[in-house]
Amino acid sequence: MTAPATLTAAQQHAADAVITSLAGPGARLRDDQLTAVSALTAPGARVLVVQATGWGKSAVYWSATAIIRAAGGGPTLIVSPLLSLMRDQVAAAHRGGLSAATLNSSNIGEWSAIEERLRGGDLDVLLVSPERLANPGFGRRVLDALAGNLGLLVIDEAHAVSDWGHDFRPDYRRVADVLRDLNPATPVLATTATANARVTADVAEQLGTQTLVLRGPLARKSLHLNVLDGLSPIQRYAWVAQSLPALPGSGIVYALTVADADRLVDAIRAVHGDDIAVAAYTGQLDADRRHELEDALLHNRVKALVATSALGMGYDKPDLGFVVHVGSPPSPVSYYQQVGRAGRALDDAVVMLLASATDDRIWEYFATATIPDPDKMRDLITALDDADEPQSVVCLLYTSDAADERP
């Protein structure tokens, strides 16, 4: 598939209206973004964009949506993996002059009204999670109605589609069913920042044999990566507390555990009191509190959020000045995703990793803590296999406990 070199005057006007609303007067699509948008104006286009965080992948699908809607096309369906990411995308779409909504577990009471708006043509963009996409009821109510009238399908974080991906999610496989049932003229865009060559090839193959792959360098020139290892836990806390005032702007300090995040916040407050505003951000907070803290960081009301991995993919603050890791992330891909929060709209941002030999033991614990005991599992399977009738959970647990007591 060869991408058209330019947009028509009407298409360019629609794209410019979105970009200037999002990025200010005079903002325009870059040539590499324009290539992707131009390709998506062709009926049946299949485009895979593999670009670094901060490249502006969302600008591509907002612009393409505006062009398609201006030409009388149907709405855009975006498959997105995180509630926080969907919330930010809805807000961005509104800033770009597009009507958008999401169907997720936090707004069940709004589903009927949103689906009615969708059927009435009042929505430009609908965002759903892969889990919602895999729900049979959602398929009957929404997908069947949309399949013949969808203007654009966007698969965000598309590496999760691939069996070879670092973050494979089985529910993303439902995308293949959606693709099969789509009107063949519906364009499809898949985006990711963390796909190696094998994952890229796998995702492209699932999209179709004529997929246009637009892959750029994943290095971020604005990020200055530093590593300081060999510090004890107390020394790492001290480094953060002492260095925080000198770090540029506001940012994120990543901790490996909830307890570490809470202790580090206490350590910073012990040194600076109320002079440096910080807060802990973990998965144990309710959605409203997490949203409140995300907004506080976005508008620089805090110097830093001390966060677990609960704050990661999908959080978009273009002027985030630094990311500090107190402990090594579980993988290079996780590290790349987390440091990618910084410096999106800055020439320079600071990234610091405070590594320790004990970090590997923490991740080994996380990886094995939920694995059941092999002997107990064998006993349970044997009990099920030997039973002549259905067994209650209580009976099965008794069987397992009795086996533990055997000499």
What are these regions (language model features)?
Residues 398-407:
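Single conserved hydrophobic/aromatic residue that forms the stacking wall/gate
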